[in-house]
Amino acid sequence: MANLGCWMLVLFVATWSNLGLCKKRPKPGGWNTGGSRYPGQGSPGGNRYPPQGGGGWGQPHGGGWGQPHGGGWGQPHGGGWGQPHGGGWGQGGGTHSQWNKPSKPKTNMKHMAGAAAAGAVVGGLGGYMLGSAMSRPIIHFGNDYEDRYYRENMYRYPNQVYYRPVDQYSNQNNFVHDCVNITIKQHTVTTTTKGENFTETDVKMMERVVEQMCITQYERESQAYYQRGSSMVLFSSPPVILLISFLIFLIVG
């Protein structure tokens, strides 16, 4: 870990040194260096602004502002704003106005609410969280009747589980046991209030289904918890702290 931090420090120092040298190099071609000059001091080719010999500001035959034959603002034959023959805003021969643009699609608030609910602490359940939706597992119960019954009724069983953080349990079995009990209880109560009852076969199948989902949830949470712990160890090592301090010094300085 210390060697990794030292190599990261060397790499960032070299990178910031190159960036500092690039910032100090002069940029070519400033204002009034080559090309057309402003005003009226052009190159030998004579590209002046305003141009000489017609086309200037306020000239009778140019394309300037307010002229009878130009393409300026407010003219009957120009391409300006609000004209009958021009290509400007709101014209018969021009492009469509912004009023005709289709409105942007609205965000589906139900999808946003569902995404926000996953992984959030559920109120009134003593710190339990609701996991993300899962595909119900394919389970074989040992006989054709139960296998067929499960396939026909699996949509009635939960596809999300309730759980507490993994650091509150000493092992996987305790996590899964608690997860199965609270999930089946909540699903049964919610479904019963809608006028639907579960048979003993339903409860047996729900226990198997929810158990598999709770094991999957435990594996996900354990991996995330391990990654968070590894990140904390990495960023708390002295070489990384020194590197972060050095970067802050470069940015502020």
From Swiss-Prot:
Biased composition (Gly residues): 52-95
Highest taxon above the source species: Eukaryota
Residues reported in the UniProt entry to bind Cu(2+) 1: 61-63
Keyword Lyase: no
Positions contributing to Cu(2+) 3 binding: 77-79
Primary location recorded for the protein, binned into one broad class: membrane
Covalent lipidation (GPI-anchor amidated serine), chain numbering: 230
Binding site for Cu(2+) 4: 85-87
Protein name: Major prion protein
Organism (species): Pongo pygmaeus (Bornean orangutan)
